[in-house]
Amino acid sequence: PPADTLAEFIGQYVAGVAASMKRIVELIGDNSSPHDCSPNFYYFHFLSQVRMYYPGIRQKIEKIYRQDYDLWEKVIQKAKESGEIRSDTDVKKTAIMFRQMFLGLSYEQAFLNGLNVDELAENFRHIYSLLKA
C-alpha cells in the first residue's frame, strides 16, 4: 500500500533500494569481481554504456528521473499540507535533496564497497528530522 506519511515513504523507498541492490547482486554476483569492484560499480558502468550507445536513451532517462522527482514532490507536498513537516518547506528543493542524496551516495560508494543502505536510511532520517514540524 502507498505510504500515508513522508516518514513511511522514506522507509518504503529505502526498502525498495535494498530490494534492487539484492537483485543487482543476484544478477552480477557478489565477491567474484576480477577487478575488486562492487556490483553497484558495474551497474553504473552499464548505465554509462547504455547512455553512450543506445539511441534515444537520453529522453527515456530524463523521463525516469522526472517520474522519481515527481513522486518525491507529491509525497513531500502531502506531508507539508498535513502538517507532518514544516509549512515553509520548499517542496522542489526538498525532493532534490532526497533524490540527490540517494544518487550521490550510490555513486560515491559504488567505487568502494557498494551502497550502504543503512547509511542511506540514516541520511534520509536526518534530512527528515530537519523538516519535521
Question: Which residue stretches match the model-derived regions?
Answer:
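C-terminal peripheral helix-coil segments that are non-catalytic and often amphipathic
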Residues: Q12-L27, D70, K74-E81, I96-A133
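Membrane-interface starts of transmembrane alpha-helices
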Residues: V91-A95
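Helical hydrophobic small-molecule/effector-binding pocket
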Residues: E8-Y53, R99
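Helix-turn-helix
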Residues: P1
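Amphipathic alpha-helical packing segments from all-alpha helical-bundle domains
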Residues: G11, A15, H35-H45, P55-E81
